Amino acid sequence: MQKTLSTLKDKINNALVVDRENYIYRCHRSIFTDPQLFEFEMKHIFEGNWVFLAHESQIPQPGDYYTLTLGRQPVIITRDKKNELHALINSCAHRGAMLCRRKTGNKNSFTCPFHGWTFSNNGKLLKAKDESTGAYPETFKHEGSHDLQKLPRFQSYRGFLFGSLKADVQPLEAYLGETCKIIDLIVDQAPEGLEVLKGSSSYVYEGNWKLGAENGADGYHVSVVHWNYASTMSRRNYEAEGTHTVDANGWSKSLGGGYGFDNGHMLLWTRALNPEVRPVYAHRERLQAEFGERRADQMVNETRNLCLYPNVYLMDQFSTQIRVIRPIAVDKTEVTIWCFAPKGESDQARALRIRQYEDFFNVSGMGTPDDLEEFSSCQRGYLGENLPWSDLSRGALRWVDGADEHAQHAGFSPRLSGVKSEDEALYIAHHHHWQTLMLAAIEQEQQRYDQSITQRVEVA
Protein backbone atom coordinates (compact mmCIF):
# COMPACT_ATOMS: atom_id res chain seq x y z
CA MET A 1 0.00 0.00 0.00
CA GLN A 2 2.78 2.41 0.98
CA LYS A 3 4.62 1.75 -2.28
CA THR A 4 1.44 2.18 -4.34
CA LEU A 5 0.68 5.54 -2.75
CA SER A 6 4.23 6.73 -3.26
CA THR A 7 4.16 5.70 -6.92
CA LEU A 8 0.82 7.41 -7.50
CA LYS A 9 2.02 10.56 -5.78
CA ASP A 10 5.02 10.74 -8.10
CA LYS A 11 2.77 10.26 -11.14
CA ILE A 12 0.43 13.03 -10.04
CA ASN A 13 3.21 15.44 -9.11
CA ASN A 14 4.79 14.93 -12.52
CA ALA A 15 1.54 14.98 -14.51
CA LEU A 16 1.56 18.70 -15.28
CA VAL A 17 4.43 20.93 -16.37
CA VAL A 18 3.95 24.68 -15.96
CA ASP A 19 7.23 26.43 -16.76
CA ARG A 20 6.33 30.09 -17.21
CA GLU A 21 9.90 31.25 -17.78
CA ASN A 22 10.38 28.96 -20.77
CA TYR A 23 6.72 28.86 -21.84
CA ILE A 24 6.44 25.10 -21.46
CA TYR A 25 2.92 23.94 -20.67
CA ARG A 26 2.04 20.27 -21.00
CA CYS A 27 0.29 17.35 -19.35
CA HIS A 28 1.35 13.72 -19.17
CA ARG A 29 -0.86 11.41 -21.19
CA SER A 30 -0.90 8.78 -18.46
CA ILE A 31 -3.62 10.82 -16.73
CA PHE A 32 -5.90 9.52 -19.49
CA THR A 33 -4.72 5.89 -19.47
CA ASP A 34 -3.63 4.85 -15.97
CA PRO A 35 -6.20 2.53 -14.30
CA GLN A 36 -4.90 3.32 -10.80
CA LEU A 37 -5.35 7.04 -11.35
CA PHE A 38 -8.85 6.35 -12.64
CA GLU A 39 -9.80 4.46 -9.47
CA PHE A 40 -8.59 7.40 -7.38
CA GLU A 41 -10.59 9.79 -9.55
CA MET A 42 -13.76 7.81 -9.05
CA LYS A 43 -13.33 7.61 -5.29
CA HIS A 44 -12.08 11.10 -4.54
CA ILE A 45 -13.42 13.29 -7.36
CA PHE A 46 -16.70 11.76 -8.48
CA GLU A 47 -17.55 10.23 -5.10
CA GLY A 48 -15.81 12.81 -2.94
CA ASN A 49 -17.09 16.22 -4.00
CA TRP A 50 -19.97 18.11 -5.59
CA VAL A 51 -21.21 16.54 -8.83
CA PHE A 52 -24.06 17.66 -11.09
CA LEU A 53 -27.10 15.36 -10.86
CA ALA A 54 -30.09 16.77 -12.76
CA HIS A 55 -32.34 19.77 -13.29
CA GLU A 56 -35.40 20.35 -11.12
CA SER A 57 -37.66 20.34 -14.17
CA GLN A 58 -36.82 16.67 -14.70
CA ILE A 59 -38.73 15.87 -11.48
CA PRO A 60 -41.58 18.40 -11.80
CA GLN A 61 -44.56 16.78 -10.03
CA PRO A 62 -45.11 15.16 -6.60
CA GLY A 63 -44.35 11.47 -6.97
CA ASP A 64 -41.92 11.97 -9.86
CA TYR A 65 -38.54 10.27 -9.71
CA TYR A 66 -35.37 10.28 -11.76
CA THR A 67 -32.50 7.79 -11.53
CA LEU A 68 -28.82 8.27 -12.29
CA THR A 69 -25.35 7.04 -11.39
CA LEU A 70 -23.14 9.19 -9.16
CA GLY A 71 -19.60 7.95 -9.51
CA ARG A 72 -20.26 4.22 -9.30
CA GLN A 73 -23.30 4.46 -7.05
CA PRO A 74 -26.97 4.30 -8.10
CA VAL A 75 -29.01 7.32 -7.02
CA ILE A 76 -32.68 8.20 -7.22
CA ILE A 77 -34.06 11.75 -6.96
CA THR A 78 -37.68 11.97 -5.82
CA ARG A 79 -40.27 14.65 -5.22
CA ASP A 80 -42.55 13.84 -2.28
CA LYS A 81 -46.15 14.87 -1.63
CA LYS A 82 -44.93 18.02 0.15
CA ASN A 83 -43.14 18.99 -3.07
CA GLU A 84 -39.73 18.47 -1.46
CA LEU A 85 -36.86 16.88 -3.36
CA HIS A 86 -34.79 14.01 -1.98
CA ALA A 87 -31.63 12.35 -3.28
CA LEU A 88 -31.35 8.74 -2.11
CA ILE A 89 -29.03 5.82 -2.74
CA ASN A 90 -31.03 3.56 -5.05
CA SER A 91 -30.33 0.44 -3.02
CA CYS A 92 -32.64 -1.44 -0.66
CA ALA A 93 -31.68 -1.15 3.01
CA HIS A 94 -32.31 -4.90 3.35
CA ARG A 95 -30.05 -6.74 0.91
CA GLY A 96 -29.00 -4.04 -1.52
CA ALA A 97 -31.10 -4.67 -4.62
CA MET A 98 -31.82 -1.60 -6.75
CA LEU A 99 -35.29 -0.38 -5.83
CA CYS A 100 -36.08 1.64 -8.92
CA ARG A 101 -35.04 0.16 -12.24
CA ARG A 102 -36.55 2.67 -14.64
CA LYS A 103 -35.08 6.01 -15.63
CA THR A 104 -38.11 8.12 -14.74
CA GLY A 105 -41.66 7.69 -13.53
CA ASN A 106 -44.14 8.62 -10.82
CA LYS A 107 -44.54 6.62 -7.60
CA ASN A 108 -45.25 7.58 -4.01
CA SER A 109 -43.55 4.45 -2.71
CA PHE A 110 -41.07 1.85 -3.88
CA THR A 111 -41.36 -1.87 -3.19
CA CYS A 112 -38.18 -3.87 -3.53
CA PRO A 113 -38.61 -6.59 -6.19
CA PHE A 114 -36.31 -8.92 -4.22
CA HIS A 115 -37.93 -9.32 -0.77
CA GLY A 116 -40.84 -6.89 -0.83
CA TRP A 117 -39.72 -4.16 1.54
CA THR A 118 -41.62 -0.94 0.87
CA PHE A 119 -40.23 2.58 1.23
CA SER A 120 -41.83 6.00 0.95
CA ASN A 121 -40.42 8.21 -1.78
CA ASN A 122 -38.81 10.30 0.97
CA GLY A 123 -36.73 7.26 1.92
CA LYS A 124 -38.59 6.11 5.03
CA LEU A 125 -39.12 2.35 5.42
CA LEU A 126 -42.89 1.83 5.56
CA LYS A 127 -42.93 -1.92 6.10
CA ALA A 128 -40.94 -5.07 5.64
CA LYS A 129 -42.67 -8.06 4.12
CA ASP A 130 -44.04 -10.31 6.89
CA GLU A 131 -42.76 -7.83 9.44
CA SER A 132 -45.20 -8.90 12.17
CA THR A 133 -44.21 -12.58 11.91
CA GLY A 134 -40.58 -12.15 10.98
CA ALA A 135 -39.21 -12.30 14.54
CA TYR A 136 -37.26 -9.09 14.07
CA PRO A 137 -35.42 -7.65 17.10
CA GLU A 138 -36.87 -4.68 18.99
CA THR A 139 -34.28 -2.38 17.45
CA PHE A 140 -35.59 -3.07 13.94
CA LYS A 141 -36.65 0.19 12.23
CA HIS A 142 -35.62 2.10 15.37
CA GLU A 143 -35.06 5.82 14.63
CA GLY A 144 -34.84 5.27 10.90
CA SER A 145 -32.22 2.54 11.15
CA HIS A 146 -33.49 0.85 7.98
CA ASP A 147 -34.52 3.88 5.94
CA LEU A 148 -32.90 4.51 2.60
CA GLN A 149 -29.60 6.35 2.74
CA LYS A 150 -29.78 9.99 1.72
CA LEU A 151 -26.92 11.72 -0.03
CA PRO A 152 -24.89 13.57 2.60
CA ARG A 153 -25.14 16.77 0.54
CA PHE A 154 -27.88 17.69 -1.93
CA GLN A 155 -28.62 21.22 -3.08
CA SER A 156 -29.96 23.29 -5.95
CA TYR A 157 -28.53 26.37 -7.58
CA ARG A 158 -31.01 28.13 -9.85
CA GLY A 159 -32.74 24.81 -10.56
CA PHE A 160 -29.55 22.82 -11.25
CA LEU A 161 -29.21 19.98 -8.73
CA PHE A 162 -25.88 18.90 -7.26
CA GLY A 163 -25.00 16.20 -4.78
CA SER A 164 -22.03 14.83 -2.88
CA LEU A 165 -21.43 11.43 -1.35
CA LYS A 166 -19.15 13.15 1.14
CA ALA A 167 -20.56 15.47 3.80
CA ASP A 168 -17.38 17.44 4.40
CA VAL A 169 -17.40 19.61 1.28
CA GLN A 170 -17.56 23.37 0.91
CA PRO A 171 -20.94 25.09 0.44
CA LEU A 172 -22.28 24.65 -3.08
CA GLU A 173 -22.21 28.33 -4.03
CA ALA A 174 -18.62 28.58 -2.81
CA TYR A 175 -17.74 25.55 -4.92
CA LEU A 176 -19.40 27.01 -8.02
CA GLY A 177 -17.81 30.38 -7.28
CA GLU A 178 -17.59 32.70 -10.26
CA THR A 179 -19.56 30.30 -12.44
CA CYS A 180 -22.72 31.29 -10.56
CA LYS A 181 -22.59 34.53 -12.56
CA ILE A 182 -22.56 32.57 -15.82
CA ILE A 183 -25.37 30.26 -14.73
CA ASP A 184 -27.31 33.41 -13.89
CA LEU A 185 -26.73 34.70 -17.43
CA ILE A 186 -28.37 31.55 -18.76
CA VAL A 187 -31.24 31.27 -16.29
CA ASP A 188 -32.12 34.97 -16.31
CA GLN A 189 -32.96 34.75 -20.01
CA ALA A 190 -36.08 32.82 -18.96
CA PRO A 191 -38.62 34.88 -16.95
CA GLU A 192 -40.61 31.73 -16.07
CA GLY A 193 -37.55 29.58 -15.49
CA LEU A 194 -35.86 26.86 -17.52
CA GLU A 195 -37.07 23.40 -18.37
CA VAL A 196 -35.34 20.34 -19.77
CA LEU A 197 -37.17 19.17 -22.86
CA LYS A 198 -38.45 15.62 -23.17
CA GLY A 199 -36.10 13.14 -24.72
CA SER A 200 -32.38 12.59 -24.33
CA SER A 201 -29.51 11.00 -26.20
CA SER A 202 -26.82 8.84 -24.65
CA TYR A 203 -23.69 7.51 -26.23
CA VAL A 204 -20.49 5.81 -25.14
CA TYR A 205 -17.07 6.66 -26.52
CA GLU A 206 -13.84 4.70 -26.18
CA GLY A 207 -11.82 7.24 -24.29
CA ASN A 208 -11.14 8.81 -20.91
CA TRP A 209 -13.67 11.18 -19.36
CA LYS A 210 -11.19 14.07 -19.38
CA LEU A 211 -11.22 14.03 -23.19
CA GLY A 212 -14.87 15.05 -23.08
CA ALA A 213 -14.21 17.59 -20.35
CA GLU A 214 -11.47 19.23 -22.41
CA ASN A 215 -13.39 19.13 -25.67
CA GLY A 216 -16.32 21.29 -24.63
CA ALA A 217 -13.90 24.15 -23.97
CA ASP A 218 -11.76 23.58 -27.05
CA GLY A 219 -12.26 26.37 -29.55
CA TYR A 220 -9.14 25.32 -31.47
CA HIS A 221 -10.63 22.15 -32.98
CA VAL A 222 -13.89 23.60 -34.31
CA SER A 223 -12.74 24.78 -37.74
CA VAL A 224 -10.87 21.50 -38.33
CA VAL A 225 -13.09 18.78 -36.90
CA HIS A 226 -16.40 20.48 -37.65
CA TRP A 227 -15.62 21.81 -41.12
CA ASN A 228 -18.45 19.64 -42.51
CA TYR A 229 -20.95 21.41 -40.26
CA ALA A 230 -19.65 24.85 -41.21
CA SER A 231 -19.61 23.93 -44.90
CA THR A 232 -23.13 22.54 -44.82
CA MET A 233 -24.48 25.60 -43.06
CA SER A 234 -22.87 27.89 -45.63
CA ARG A 235 -24.58 25.98 -48.44
CA ARG A 236 -27.98 25.47 -46.82
CA ASN A 237 -30.94 26.83 -48.78
CA TYR A 238 -32.39 29.28 -46.28
CA GLU A 239 -34.90 30.58 -48.80
CA ALA A 240 -36.43 27.10 -48.73
CA GLU A 241 -36.91 27.37 -44.95
CA GLY A 242 -33.64 25.72 -43.97
CA THR A 243 -32.87 26.08 -40.25
CA HIS A 244 -30.84 29.21 -39.52
CA THR A 245 -27.87 28.49 -37.28
CA VAL A 246 -25.21 30.35 -35.32
CA ASP A 247 -22.22 30.92 -37.61
CA ALA A 248 -19.58 28.33 -36.70
CA ASN A 249 -16.85 30.70 -37.87
CA GLY A 250 -17.43 32.65 -34.66
CA TRP A 251 -15.08 30.24 -32.86
CA SER A 252 -12.11 31.44 -34.91
CA LYS A 253 -13.04 34.68 -36.67
CA SER A 254 -14.90 36.55 -33.94
CA LEU A 255 -13.96 37.89 -30.54
CA GLY A 256 -13.74 35.15 -27.97
CA GLY A 257 -11.69 33.57 -25.24
CA GLY A 258 -11.59 31.13 -22.37
CA TYR A 259 -11.35 31.26 -18.59
CA GLY A 260 -10.03 28.84 -16.01
CA PHE A 261 -11.79 29.34 -12.67
CA ASP A 262 -11.21 28.04 -9.16
CA ASN A 263 -12.20 24.40 -8.59
CA GLY A 264 -11.48 23.38 -12.17
CA HIS A 265 -14.45 25.10 -13.83
CA MET A 266 -13.97 26.48 -17.36
CA LEU A 267 -15.75 28.86 -19.71
CA LEU A 268 -15.34 29.15 -23.48
CA TRP A 269 -17.06 32.19 -24.98
CA THR A 270 -17.36 33.88 -28.35
CA ARG A 271 -19.06 36.90 -29.81
CA ALA A 272 -21.81 35.60 -32.12
CA LEU A 273 -21.39 36.71 -35.73
CA ASN A 274 -25.12 36.40 -36.41
CA PRO A 275 -26.96 36.66 -33.06
CA GLU A 276 -30.26 37.33 -34.83
CA VAL A 277 -30.69 33.58 -35.49
CA ARG A 278 -30.72 32.75 -31.76
CA PRO A 279 -34.14 32.42 -30.08
CA VAL A 280 -33.04 34.81 -27.30
CA TYR A 281 -32.50 37.62 -29.82
CA ALA A 282 -36.24 38.35 -29.99
CA HIS A 283 -36.17 39.24 -26.26
CA ARG A 284 -33.25 41.67 -26.33
CA GLU A 285 -35.35 44.75 -25.50
CA ARG A 286 -36.98 43.06 -22.51
CA LEU A 287 -33.60 41.85 -21.28
CA GLN A 288 -32.09 45.32 -21.66
CA ALA A 289 -34.91 46.84 -19.64
CA GLU A 290 -34.66 44.20 -16.92
CA PHE A 291 -30.91 43.64 -16.62
CA GLY A 292 -29.26 46.62 -18.29
CA GLU A 293 -27.30 46.99 -21.49
CA ARG A 294 -24.17 45.12 -20.41
CA ARG A 295 -25.79 41.92 -19.14
CA ALA A 296 -28.36 41.86 -21.93
CA ASP A 297 -25.55 42.14 -24.46
CA GLN A 298 -23.82 39.14 -22.88
CA MET A 299 -27.02 37.09 -22.96
CA VAL A 300 -27.95 37.92 -26.55
CA ASN A 301 -24.68 38.46 -28.40
CA GLU A 302 -22.29 36.01 -26.73
CA THR A 303 -22.21 32.23 -26.80
CA ARG A 304 -20.88 30.20 -23.90
CA ASN A 305 -19.77 26.69 -23.01
CA LEU A 306 -19.59 26.37 -19.22
CA CYS A 307 -17.85 23.36 -17.67
CA LEU A 308 -18.80 22.71 -14.06
CA TYR A 309 -16.15 20.39 -12.69
CA PRO A 310 -16.07 17.50 -13.03
CA ASN A 311 -19.02 16.23 -15.04
CA VAL A 312 -21.31 18.70 -16.78
CA TYR A 313 -21.39 21.30 -19.52
CA LEU A 314 -24.09 23.95 -19.75
CA MET A 315 -24.00 25.11 -23.36
CA ASP A 316 -25.64 28.21 -24.76
CA GLN A 317 -24.31 28.49 -28.31
CA PHE A 318 -25.42 26.61 -31.49
CA SER A 319 -28.39 25.69 -29.29
CA THR A 320 -28.87 25.07 -25.57
CA GLN A 321 -27.67 21.84 -24.03
CA ILE A 322 -26.91 20.04 -20.78
CA ARG A 323 -24.11 17.53 -21.39
CA VAL A 324 -23.33 15.08 -18.57
CA ILE A 325 -20.10 13.09 -18.60
CA ARG A 326 -20.06 9.76 -16.72
CA PRO A 327 -16.83 7.77 -16.46
CA ILE A 328 -17.29 4.02 -16.86
CA ALA A 329 -13.67 2.88 -17.16
CA VAL A 330 -10.33 4.54 -17.74
CA ASP A 331 -10.96 4.23 -21.49
CA LYS A 332 -14.77 4.29 -21.65
CA THR A 333 -17.15 7.18 -20.99
CA GLU A 334 -20.90 7.66 -21.25
CA VAL A 335 -22.31 11.04 -22.28
CA THR A 336 -25.98 12.00 -21.96
CA ILE A 337 -27.37 15.17 -23.50
CA TRP A 338 -30.59 17.15 -23.18
CA CYS A 339 -31.91 20.31 -24.76
CA PHE A 340 -33.14 22.92 -22.29
CA ALA A 341 -35.23 26.01 -22.97
CA PRO A 342 -37.16 28.84 -21.31
CA LYS A 343 -40.57 27.80 -20.09
CA GLY A 344 -43.39 29.35 -22.07
CA GLU A 345 -41.36 30.28 -25.15
CA SER A 346 -43.28 30.51 -28.42
CA ASP A 347 -43.83 27.46 -30.60
CA GLN A 348 -41.74 29.09 -33.31
CA ALA A 349 -38.79 29.72 -30.98
CA ARG A 350 -39.04 26.23 -29.49
CA ALA A 351 -39.04 24.62 -32.92
CA LEU A 352 -36.01 26.67 -33.99
CA ARG A 353 -34.13 25.75 -30.80
CA ILE A 354 -34.78 22.03 -31.29
CA ARG A 355 -33.82 22.09 -34.98
CA GLN A 356 -30.56 23.91 -34.12
CA TYR A 357 -29.93 21.35 -31.38
CA GLU A 358 -30.49 18.44 -33.77
CA ASP A 359 -28.22 19.98 -36.41
CA PHE A 360 -25.12 19.95 -34.23
CA PHE A 361 -25.53 18.29 -30.83
CA ASN A 362 -27.69 15.24 -31.47
CA VAL A 363 -25.99 11.86 -31.76
CA SER A 364 -27.00 11.89 -35.42
CA GLY A 365 -26.03 15.57 -35.80
CA MET A 366 -23.09 17.06 -37.64
CA GLY A 367 -20.93 17.72 -34.56
CA THR A 368 -21.03 14.85 -32.09
CA PRO A 369 -19.87 11.95 -34.34
CA ASP A 370 -16.79 13.90 -35.42
CA ASP A 371 -15.78 14.58 -31.82
CA LEU A 372 -16.23 10.94 -30.79
CA GLU A 373 -13.93 9.77 -33.57
CA GLU A 374 -11.21 12.10 -32.27
CA PHE A 375 -11.70 10.96 -28.66
CA SER A 376 -11.13 7.30 -29.53
CA SER A 377 -8.22 8.24 -31.78
CA CYS A 378 -6.57 10.20 -28.95
CA GLN A 379 -7.08 7.35 -26.50
CA ARG A 380 -5.33 4.95 -28.86
CA GLY A 381 -2.59 7.49 -29.53
CA TYR A 382 -1.96 7.98 -25.81
CA LEU A 383 -0.74 4.38 -25.66
CA GLY A 384 2.35 5.49 -27.58
CA GLU A 385 4.50 5.75 -24.46
CA ASN A 386 7.53 7.02 -26.36
CA LEU A 387 5.65 10.28 -26.85
CA PRO A 388 4.24 10.83 -23.35
CA TRP A 389 3.32 14.54 -23.31
CA SER A 390 0.48 16.65 -24.71
CA ASP A 391 1.28 20.29 -25.44
CA LEU A 392 -1.01 22.96 -23.98
CA SER A 393 0.91 26.10 -24.88
CA ARG A 394 -1.28 27.65 -27.57
CA GLY A 395 -1.71 31.32 -26.72
CA ALA A 396 0.88 31.26 -23.93
CA LEU A 397 2.42 34.55 -25.04
CA ARG A 398 -0.89 36.34 -24.56
CA TRP A 399 -2.45 34.57 -21.56
CA VAL A 400 -3.47 36.82 -18.70
CA ASP A 401 -3.19 35.89 -15.03
CA GLY A 402 -6.56 36.73 -13.53
CA ALA A 403 -9.15 38.67 -15.51
CA ASP A 404 -8.57 39.95 -19.04
CA GLU A 405 -10.38 43.02 -20.36
CA HIS A 406 -13.49 41.08 -21.34
CA ALA A 407 -13.70 39.36 -17.95
CA GLN A 408 -13.36 42.68 -16.16
CA HIS A 409 -16.16 44.12 -18.29
CA ALA A 410 -18.31 41.05 -17.64
CA GLY A 411 -17.60 41.06 -13.91
CA PHE A 412 -15.82 37.67 -13.88
CA SER A 413 -12.75 36.85 -11.78
CA PRO A 414 -10.98 33.85 -13.35
CA ARG A 415 -7.62 32.45 -12.30
CA LEU A 416 -6.37 32.54 -15.87
CA SER A 417 -7.64 34.10 -19.11
CA GLY A 418 -7.08 33.04 -22.70
CA VAL A 419 -7.80 36.04 -24.89
CA LYS A 420 -8.63 33.94 -27.96
CA SER A 421 -11.17 31.13 -28.09
CA GLU A 422 -8.46 28.81 -29.46
CA ASP A 423 -6.11 29.44 -26.50
CA GLU A 424 -5.41 26.56 -24.13
CA ALA A 425 -4.90 28.54 -20.93
CA LEU A 426 -8.08 27.23 -19.33
CA TYR A 427 -6.76 23.65 -19.43
CA ILE A 428 -3.87 24.64 -17.19
CA ALA A 429 -6.24 25.72 -14.41
CA HIS A 430 -8.48 22.71 -15.13
CA HIS A 431 -5.73 20.10 -14.84
CA HIS A 432 -4.07 21.90 -11.95
CA HIS A 433 -7.30 21.44 -10.00
CA TRP A 434 -7.25 17.73 -10.88
CA GLN A 435 -3.68 17.56 -9.60
CA THR A 436 -4.61 19.36 -6.37
CA LEU A 437 -7.56 17.03 -5.70
CA MET A 438 -5.54 13.91 -6.42
CA LEU A 439 -2.64 14.94 -4.19
CA ALA A 440 -5.11 15.67 -1.39
CA ALA A 441 -6.56 12.20 -1.96
CA ILE A 442 -3.11 10.66 -1.60
CA GLU A 443 -2.69 12.44 1.74
CA GLN A 444 -6.08 11.15 2.92
CA GLU A 445 -5.22 7.59 1.96
CA GLN A 446 -1.82 7.92 3.61
CA GLN A 447 -3.43 9.10 6.85
CA ARG A 448 -5.87 6.17 6.79
CA TYR A 449 -3.02 3.76 6.18
CA ASP A 450 -0.94 5.23 9.02
CA GLN A 451 -3.93 5.06 11.38
CA SER A 452 -4.55 1.42 10.50
CA ILE A 453 -0.91 0.57 11.21
CA THR A 454 -1.09 2.39 14.56
CA GLN A 455 -4.27 0.52 15.51
CA ARG A 456 -2.71 -2.83 14.66
CA VAL A 457 0.31 -2.04 16.82
CA GLU A 458 -1.93 -1.00 19.73
CA VAL A 459 -3.99 -4.19 19.46
CA ALA A 460 -0.86 -6.30 19.32
What are these regions (language model features)?
Residues 9-29:
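Short, contiguous pre-domain boundary segments
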Residues 46-50, 97, 221:
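Generic structural signal for secondary-structure transition and capping sites
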Residues 1-14, 451-460:
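Basic/polar N-terminal segments that are highly enriched at the extreme N-terminus
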Residues 47-60, 133-137, 303-309:
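Short Pro/Gly-enriched beta-strand edge/turn motifs at strand-loop
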Residues 84, 152-460:
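C-terminal catalytic domain of Rieske-type non-heme iron oxygenases
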Residues 58-181:
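Rieske [2Fe-2S] iron-sulfur-binding domain
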Residues 31, 35-46, 51-70:
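Glycine/alanine-rich phosphate-binding loops at beta-alpha junctions
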